[in-house]
Amino acid sequence: MNIKQLQILDAVVRFGSYRKAAAHLRCSQSTITFQLKNLENSLGCFLFEKAGRHMVLTPAGRTALKEAQKILASHSVLMNLKGSKSSLTGRLR
């Protein structure tokens, strides 16, 4: 499991399709499918199920999404620190 897979899960749910998520993330639809399949294998459960022509989250998928969003929020905070100049500055005497 990696951050990219969690971003893909979040994007698929947010945009409602693999195609739109792929466009947003600037990757191919097959990359989306491959990465989600790898995430499902890592977690040992299915994240989506077909409902007619649409994909809907399974109960495990809803839990995974909720936790993924927490991780992505924390990741964003940490990445913002990377560029921050919050270290001590000034003149030493």
Give residue ranges: language-model regions.
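The N-cap/first-turn positions of alpha helices
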Residues: 2-5, 29, 61
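Short alpha-helical "packing" element that flanks the helix-turn-helix/winged-helix DNA-binding module
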Residues: 8-12, 64
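Short helix-boundary/capping micro-motifs
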Residues: 12-26
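Helix-turn-helix DNA-binding elements, focusing on the entry/boundary residues of the two helices
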Residues: 17-18, 36, 50
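Core residues of bacterial helix-turn-helix
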Residues: 24-25, 36, 43, 64
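A short LG(V/I)-centered, amphipathic sequence patch enriched
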Residues: 40-57
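Interdomain hinge and pocket-entrance segments immediately C-terminal to HTH DNA-binding domains
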Residues: 82-93
